[in-house]
Amino acid sequence: MHSEPENCVIEGDLTCLIPATEAHLPLLADWFTDPEFVRNWGGQPLTREEVAAKYTGRRRPDVESFLILAQTVPVGYVQYAPAGPGQGGIDMVLLPQAQGKGLGPDAARALVRHLHTVLGWTQVTVDPEASNTHAIRAWAKAGLRPVGRQGSHLLMECLPAHSVSPTEIHDEGFPPRA
């Protein structure tokens, strides 16, 4: 493990997730106005007002928003939204310079583990662009598997193993290998 900030609420091996707040608006606004950052997040840069409304925690409890930190350095954003009892979806985006270092899969594993074990979710879904092979590989490393397509998106999900208690779920959402 590594040194974590005091406000780390979901901890991975390489990352920790902290709730996004209004105090993070300058950072988030810089990120979400950068065409490279949003290339795989809707593709269009957002205004500061849109970022404030969507990504600083104003939509809680409908959408929970987090900064992803590597050590104490912000490297990305992740959110989850319930879609029904025991299920919901995750969206995540990393800074281009943070990609390819295992940070995305680590943050995703930590969040999936939290959703399964703390919140009792039985189904976690993501929907990356089918052309975004980098994201698809990262989600697969986090334990999500393709289950279908919806338009230009690949639907992936992670189900906890049947007949395994939430405390026995391995990082990828499946029981540990023997």
Kindly give the residue locations of the regions a language model identified.
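Short acidic N-proximal helix/loop "leader" segments that mark the beginning
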Residues: 1-11
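A short beta-loop-alpha structural element at the N-terminal edge
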Residues: 15-30
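Acetyl-CoA-dependent GNAT
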Residues: 22, 39-99, 114, 119, ...
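Conserved acetyl-CoA-binding loop-helix of GNAT-fold acetyltransferases
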Residues: 100-114, 136-141
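Conserved GNAT acetyl-CoA-binding A-motif
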Residues: 117-127
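Conserved beta-strand-loop-alpha-helix junction that forms the acyl-donor binding cleft
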Residues: 125-136, 153
